[in-house]
């Protein structure tokens, strides 16, 4: 029942990122990276020592044979080297410039394999005839060739031509829970896998078949733990493996079958050897893409996959074309870089806004001009003309007015912007100034008295009352038709010095 529910809850992946969960739980990544670097350093030192020994031997050989060579032969060799090197350099640069791409088909296929084929309903319904187990028990031959397992293991070993050109035996030697090119081969079932692991005879023959295919690839099994190494004929077999790329599909099948039949620990050493030969030693350069795209992702343990990918990333050339790395860390580094570049500009923008907003707060309203008295008598008429042009109806809103019985109006300024007026019975308006900024001087001097509202507010109320009584201005109505002169001003005190009132505002018609 559990398998049925897993099939119902399974969601088909739609992207490569959905299929690849290698870097999702990268716990202990730093420790793994340190271990990988230590292994790489040790391997690098060993390779350098071997290279140094080879160089010393070559130098000795060239020194011994250099006396026999003539000058013309050396010139010809140098010319040939100059001719061939540019072509090799161009081809290598062209190959390096091609950036690889992830295959969604490969990622989805290996995702299903690592998750034990969640949509494989056939595994639940198919009859358990155990064809693969009976073949390994040497009870039935494989179809369609009709050859038993013992004949394959004994007579086909070392026959590289037969192993290369026959395409029907590999599905029987390394069965999977998926259909292959040989439609006569039966798919594995979960029940058959359990029975296969329990049968020692079948497991023994399975290991022998694995050794036979390793020999075909130029590799040999070193121990029972699955460690592998180069075979004596590795140079010839690696060259053949580099040219016959259809064998990469066989390697992928072998790796999958190892995991199905209980030999998951055999896969990392074999994959690492292929990465070593294809990326580092460059003996099988055509295998590079398949090793990174297929072989690595047959391993079910994420930690093992990360180790192998770090090893490959360390040696991959050019490094910017390595697309199997941790995407989360790359994005985090990019985000950090973008944050460092964006924060100064944003701070500048905020400071610029603050600089612009500060002057707006410091703007003050213009102060109302005070009444000024000209010392020269000839300028009195000019001052009165300016007063007439600038007088407005705000006198009513700024000053307090009193309407008397005789029609005159007396206005009193109360040092506030919204003054009040009192209308008299006679129709005149009396305005009383209480917000003047006048500073009293000596009684003998003829200087002007300024009407400053701020200075007047600081005075006590008693002083303001006396000042207002001395500076009463009576506005009289003169002519109805006159628009230029709104009113005539007459001093309210007996003093010979005339106090003039200048009101700032918009122009209005005469009082009625």
UniProtKB/Swiss-Prot annotation:
| GO terms for cellular component | membrane
Any GO molecular function:
opioid growth factor receptor activity
Positions of the region Disordered? 1-72, 323-469, 488-512
Residue spans of biased composition, Basic and acidic residues class: 328-337, 449-468
Q: What is this protein called?
A: Opioid growth factor receptor-like protein 1
Stretches with biased composition (Polar residues): 408-421, 490-499
Question: Which family, according to UniProt?
Answer: Belongs to the opioid growth factor receptor family.
Q: Which Pfam families match?
A: OGFr_N
InterPro entries reported for this sequence: OGF_rcpt, OGFr
Q: Where is the composition biased (Acidic residues)?
A: 28-54, 62-71
> Which species is the source of this protein?
Xenopus tropicalis (Western clawed frog)
Q: Which residue spans adopt a coiled-coil conformation according to this UniProt entry?
A: none
Q: Where is the composition biased (Basic residues)?
A: 347-361
Q: Which residues cross the membrane?
A: none
According to the lineage, what is the superkingdom? Eukaryota
